[in-house]
Regions:
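N-terminal Sec signal peptide cleavage junction
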Residues: 1-2
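Extracytoplasmic "Venus flytrap"
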Residues: 9, 13-53
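Hydrophobic alpha-helical
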Residues: 100-106, 217-235
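Extracytoplasmic ligand/sensor domains, especially the bilobed periplasmic-binding protein
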Residues: 92-187, 240, 247-255
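Structural motif
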Residues: 67-87, 142-145, 195-209
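Segments of small-molecule ligand-sensing domains
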Residues: 284, 288-358, 377-381
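Extracellular/periplasmic periplasmic-binding protein-like sensory domains
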Residues: 232-302
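Signal peptide-proximal N-terminal region
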Residues: 51-72
């Protein structure tokens, strides 16, 4: 089944839309790409649609030489595996599956006989198939990169890791702590229970006492933006504080709490730098609602198409892309396939009230430009 295109609306300000990120003109053979997504799954249809929309937005802007065939699947890993076998017979490259269990099933099936771009990280003990490249977004990769970034900026001293009881918080805290230890650094972990969106008051009081008696060099927050806001309201904002995409409060200046000013975190260019050249040329996606997670999956779809397009031209080479999800490095050499994503580092700006008034060339007053929520910073990654 061939996919439907995504319409490219005009930019929000009415000006011509920025050019799509430049790539070398397509000079490979005509290629058929199967997009294998759980669009028939009750649980995963919405995430799958976000990926599909991003993939097709990228294809519509750079369609030369590439035919996309959509292969919808259901919930089960076996259904995805059966669909993969059929897709591999009729296509040159397969993009998918999306579900972690389906990727794991495929990775251990022996069925991978075409270049395959998996959209999630399988939890398997055996090496991945030679023709499988995994490009899914990873909480753990983010946390490890934040550890490297923080270590480069804070070369001495202990890190205090703040986490909650949710599984994703534990994963972030564990990945940061492991990488921090590998870098030869010391850390302590404090768990902050929360219920109904509110961090436990007794835990915050204990944290204040701890910081007073044993101040760390920095804080790593495996929390969401709301939890981190409550922590900083309680203990102050003086300590250097790092996080991953989970602490992103969104791009609306009015919704960013003052307590988050100065927090440094990694996230996708798509969600923190809408004017970045790798992002601005693509249509924004509104069908996923206001949450950031659907937007991240849409950006993953954009980059999945771009990686597939490059792979068609350089099946055994190495290449880099300035993508919607970060700076991508792919090596398709004779050894194990390698993929690395480096996300954008930003600091939350202080967007408090201002009386700034600009004067135009005619001497009249004009409205100040929109204030940016995030300031990109060098991470050294």
């Amino acid at each position: 089944m061939q996919t439907n295109p995504v319409e490219l609306p005009p930019s929000a300000d009415g000006n011509p839309r920025a050019a799509a990120p430049s790539s070398a003109p397509y000079n490979g053979p005509a290629v058929r790409v199967a997009l294998l997504l759980p669009l028939d799954s009750q649980a995963l249809a919405q995430p799958a649609e976000a990926v599909r929309a991003g993939f097709m937005a990228a294809h519509q802007l750079q369609p030369e030489g590439v035919t996309v065939n959509l292969v919808p699947t259901g919930d089960s890993a076996q259904a995805a595996l059966d669909a993969y076998r059929g897709a591999a017979e009729q296509n040159d490259i397969v993009v998918g599956p999306l579900a972690r269990s389906a990727v794991a099933s495929l990775a251990t099936s022996g069925a991978v006989n075409k270049p395959t771009i998996a959209l999630n990280h399988p939890q398997v003990n055996s090496p991945l198939p030679r023709q499988m490249l995994v490009i899914g977004l990873s909480l753990e990769d983010e946390a490890r990169q934040v550890a490297e970034w923080a270590a480069s900026e804070q070369p001495v001293g202990q890190a205090l890791v703040l986490t909650g009881r949710a599984a994703w918080q534990q994963r972030l805290a564990g990945a940061f702590s492991q990488r921090w230890a590998e870098l030869g650094r010391s850390q302590a972990t404090v768990e902050l229970p929360a219920e109904g969106g509110y961090v436990d008051g007794n835990a915050l009081a204990e944290l204040r006492a701890r910081l007073s008696s044993e101040p760390p060099q920095l804080v790593y927050a495996a929390l969401d933006a709301n939890g981190l806001r409550q922590v900083r309201m309680s203990v102050g904002t003086s300590l250097p504080t790092y996080g991953t995409a989970s602490v992103n409060p969104g791009l609306d200046p009015a919704s960013v709490a003052a307590e988050l000013a100065g927090v440094r975190f990694l996230d996708l260019p798509w969600t923190v730098q809408p004017d970045h050249p790798a992002v601005a040329g693509y249509p924004r996606w509104s069908a996923g609602g206001q949450g950031l997670d659907p937007q991240r999956l849409y950006a993953l779809g954009i980059d999945a198409y771009r990686v597939a397009r490059e792979l068609a031209q350089r099946p055994n080479g190495a290449f880099e892309l300035d993508g919607a999800t970060g700076r991508l490095s792919v090596n398709m050499g004779q050894g194990e396939r390698a993929f690395r994503r480096v996300e954008t580092g930003v600091v939350v700006r202080d967007n408090g009230p201002t009386d700034q008034i600009l004067t135009d060339d005619a001497g009249g007053d004009s409205v100040p430009p929109p204030r940016r929520v995030f300031e990109p910073v060098s991470t050294g990654l």
